[in-house]
Amino acid sequence: MSDTGGDRARLRRYTKLPVWVVEDHQEVLPFIYRAIGSKHLPDSNISFLHLDSHPDLLIPVNMPADTVFDKEALFGELSIENWIMPAVYAGHFSQVIWLHPTWAQQIREGKHCFLVGKDISTTTIRVTSTDSYFLSDGLFVPEDQLENRRPLQLDVILVEPYTLCSKQDDSDSVSSTKKPKLALGSGESSAAADGHSCSEGRRGDAVTPRSDHACQEPSCSRSGGQQSQNTATAGAILDILKTGDAFVLDIDLDFFSVKNPFKEMFTQDEYKILQELYQFKKPDSNLPEDGLVDVVEARTHQLEDLEAVFADLCDGDSEETVQSWASNPGMESLVPLVQSLKKRMEVPDYEMVHQAGLTCDYSELPHHISTEEEIEYLIQSVYFLLKSLPKPTLVTIARSSLDDYCPPEQVDMIQGKVLDVLHSLYGTLDTHLVYSEESPLS
């Protein structure tokens, strides 16, 4: 890790590795801020290693950027999908590494270099990234429209679980009946370690793409290649971590098994209508900047209109009200949607309907309920990856089970396996089960 100005040398050290386990993911941020305040983490240049089925890299759309400098006000504004970027704008995180499973493909693979800053026209936080993940939420602005710019290096890296093909030394694994090899996206070694650095003057979003996007089937003959991928990718992540002064390990348990809870709330036809109403068509990759501005403006108006529709329906969903909104271009399917909802429930939760719609842009939320075997393969992949990296300053874990993103029937089992991995790698832990009323320590 870097040692700029001796910052790292002046940091305090924990006797035992703190592990904070929360329910909703945004609840980890106060513990990271606490570590900054106690000088266990630096105020800036923190690397953030984020294992999750969701990027969590959106931004509270209407929150004034300066809210980040009032931490109590900030914590009250955050939700599960938008808690990381405010910490980037505040200057704390400079490198974010999103490690994702095969079923989560929300952001393009590779290295993304862009700016996070204050939009001079709206005073909200915005980015210069042109990835559809940000465009679909109306978060892109040109560089010259930002002030107080913070450069961010975002590396998106795929973690692939493979079954064990060759005999493996029991001493080099977490205790398990199945000990698969680590396999990570083969394109990532070049993407993350190509020598390209993010600079504050970069325009837009520089992306080094993956060389392959397909999920490859495990093969015993490929075990040597898998080990090479493991070494190369771990080395690339290590190079990224070296540019920071400290690193935080963050794990969402839905990384190992994930549900799209909205699929259980709505019928197939209702969900299809939501996809039609909220759809976002990805722009051409060669669209000029002014064209992207137009795309974002149109998308913002679309989302504002839909928010107004469902806010109005919360006040009253009479046939007259529904027909009035449905007469607008693109809103015709509102009539069958409301009719279907009212048949199934006495009082539809239109606010929840809107929240579900917001997830239906250019792709669906990931949905993959893993078998116990699949979970074990991913657990071992994570073990071998972390074994190649330095010890983090602290670990944060989100259960994500009360909102059904991590299957509630699996979450305790997954949590136990993750804590076993951490104990195996780092020894005695200072574990805080924040989600539990008793919050025991171990």
UniProtKB/Swiss-Prot annotation:
Residues 197-215 have a biased composition (Basic and acidic residues). Keywords: Phosphoprotein. Residues 183-196 have a biased composition (Low complexity). Residues 167-228 are annotated as: Disordered. The lineage of its organism: Eukaryota, Metazoa, Chordata, Craniata, Vertebrata. Belongs to the UPF0489 family. The modification Phosphothreonine is found at T15. Signal peptide: none annotated. This is UPF0489 protein C5orf22 homolog. Pfam families: UPF0489 (PF12640). InterPro entries: UPF0489. Residues 218-228 have a biased composition (Polar residues). The modification Phosphoserine is found at S285.
